[in-house]
Amino acid sequence: MNNHFKCIGIVGHPRHPTALTTHEMLYRWLCTKGYEVIVEQQIAHELQLKNVKTGTLAEIGQLADLAVVVGGDGNMLGAARTLARYDIKVIGINRGNLGFLTDLDPDNAQQQLADVLEGHYTSEKRFLLEAQVCQQDCQKRISTAINEVVLHPGKVAHMIEFEVYIDEIFAFSQRSDGLIISTPTGSTAYSLSAGGPILTPSLDAITLVPMFPHTLSARPLVINSSSTIRLRFSHRRNDLEISCDSQIALPIQEGEDVLIRRCDYHLNLIHPKDYSYLNTLSTKLGWSKKLF
């Protein structure tokens, strides 16, 4: 065993037997290598592991040096919002579909992870967004997002009228089905489907992408990630929501505004040494191959 990582957390919410098999393989392999291993409580229960150290995501974030997330991007997003609050590195084994955030191939994960544990990896910091639903002199409702914060109707799709302020300066008003506010990490997710630009992860930028705007002039807008975005609503309704990574919903009540800004903390994401963001885009999005 080396000194790069001493305590490793195993994280994920398995949805099919093959994912559970990967969790079990990973646990037993790390134990034979002499690492201290903390298994997320739900995984330990489903695998019926005995005499194993278990913990919540927060406890893994506090105690472990590295968290290995087994699953798809959805599992990674759910875990990363909590793990980003702590000084822990995170890597993923892909047991989902595209796997933009989960680099390791499940068929070769053991060898790839062995190289990472020997210190052969690259690291990067991915910033998160913080969304606040607030009204003057009232308690705020707050959540965070790795990919995007989305304004949308709560139940039935309909046009929303709202105003956008950037650093408290009026930017534009819009009638649309909603608005996607995305990080560079989320620029290959929901934002991309709505016609937003792809941003490389190192950019300190946020994109604002309209959803089906009732105009031909609305276009995605890219702003500095240090900016604060305020959403105000011209016709008060009580059926609007803000969703974070399509996993957490915050209802918007009459008279409330929405504030979106960059979080104070980052996700410490690591990759195998041969990782290339552009190669990932080409592979996942089916871009054309080189001509010569």
From Swiss-Prot:
Name used for this protein in its record: NAD kinase
Residues the entry annotates as binding NAD(+): D73, G74, N147, E148, H158, R175, D177, T188, A189, Y190, S191, L192, S193, Q247
Protein's organism: Shigella dysenteriae serotype 1 (strain Sd197)
Highest taxon above the source species: Bacteria
PANTHER family documented for this protein: NAD KINASE
GO biological process, one term: NAD metabolic process
Main localization of the protein described in the UniProt heading: cytoplasm
One GO MF term attached to the UniProt entry: metal ion binding
Subcellular location(s) of the protein: Cytoplasm
Cofactor(s), by name: a divalent metal cation
GO CC annotation: cytoplasm
Signal peptide positions (record): none
Transmembrane segments: none
